[in-house]
Design a protein with these regions (language model features):
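All-alpha prenyltransferase/terpene-synthase fold signal
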Residues: 1-114
């Protein structure tokens, strides 16, 4: 869940909010969940063009904007909420403790990437 949230923030937040340069995952051609889901939704011709542009390092800001405005983002958010929900359910079996409370809060925070 943490990695998915980080991938979302790389596309959706500002550099001031995240404390890092945005779009670095795309610039480094990292296969993130948002990228994978977005590519799967594209027609084949557009998918090949996007992959070519990514591998050449061109049009990164445009591709980041396309991903962030696509239906893929809703899908990725849904997957993130699912993982956080699963984590919360697993925590119910643990005895009450400060660690359990901290993990529960972490799952809650991670489920809201913006």
């Amino acid at each position: 869940a943490f990695q998915i949230r980080d991938d979302l923030l790389d596309l959706l937040s500002t550099e001031q909010q995240s404390g890092k340069t945005l779009g670095t995952d795309l610039a480094e051609c990292k296969l993130t969940l948002p990228l994978i889901v977005w590519l799967r939704q594209l027609p084949e011709k557009q998918k090949q063009a996007a992959i070519k542009n990514l591998s050449e390092g061109s049009q990164i800001p445009r591709i980041a904007e396309q991903i962030s405005q696509s239906p893929a983002m809703q899908q990725v958010r849904k997957i993130l909420r699912k993982f956080c929900g699963q984590a919360s359910r697993f925590l119910t079996d643990l005895p009450d403790s400060a660690a359990k409370e901290a993990l529960s809060k972490l799952a809650e925070i991670l489920s809201c990437p913006e």
